[in-house]
Curated annotation (Swiss-Prot):
Task performed by this protein: Component of LSm protein complexes, which are involved in RNA processing and may function in a chaperone-like manner. Component of the cytoplasmic LSM1-LSM7 complex which is involved in mRNA degradation by activating the decapping step. The LSM1-LSM7 complex loads onto the 3'-end of single stranded RNA. Component of the nuclear LSM2-LSM8 complex, which is involved in spliceosome assembly. The LSM2-LSM8 complex plays a role in the biogenesis of the spliceosomal U4/U6-U5 tri-snRNP complex by accelerating prp24-mediated annealing of U4/U6 di-snRNA.
GO terms for biological process, alphabetical: maturation of SSU-rRNA; mRNA splicing, via spliceosome; telomerase holoenzyme complex assembly; tRNA processing
Protein location: Cytoplasm; Nucleus, Nucleolus
Subunit: Component of the heptameric LSM1-LSM7 complex that forms a seven-membered ring structure with a donut shape. The LSm subunits are arranged in the order lsm1, lsm2, lsm3, lsm6, lsm5, lsm7 and lsm4. Component of the heptameric LSM2-LSM8 complex that forms a seven-membered ring structure with a donut shape. The LSm subunits are arranged in the order lsm8, lsm2, lsm3, lsm6, lsm5, lsm7 and lsm4.
Protein's name according to its UniProt entry: LSM complex subunit lsm6
Domain Sm: 4-75
GO CC annotation terms, alphabetical: Lsm1-7-Pat1 complex; Lsm2-8 complex; nucleolus; nucleus; P-body; sno(s)RNA-containing ribonucleoprotein complex; spliceosomal complex; telomerase holoenzyme complex
Length: 75
């Protein structure tokens, strides 16, 4: 088990993640980088609203204050 959120986030860079926003919208993609404010950059991003895929993006940038949680996904 990871000892801190930062340790977990650094461990999942380059891996597929699920990001849930406070609005309830989900993004799935490859976490490419993040900063100290938890702003996130994703590659090969899919957007899900109410469980349905609504958009596909090459790259997406998500502002950290909108993030409810980040979860690692199986490859």
């Amino acid at each position: 088990m990871d000892s801190s959120p930062n340790e977990f986030l650094n461990k999942v860079i380059g891996k597929k993640v699920l990001i849930r926003l406070s609005s309830g919208v989900d993004y799935k993609g490859i976490l490419s980088c993040l900063d100290g404010y938890m702003n996130l950059a994703l590659e090969r991003t899919e957007e899900y609203v109410n469980g349905k895929k609504t958009n596909v993006y090459g790259d997406a940038f998500i502002r950290g204050n909108n993030v409810l949680y980040v979860s690692a996904l199986d490859d």
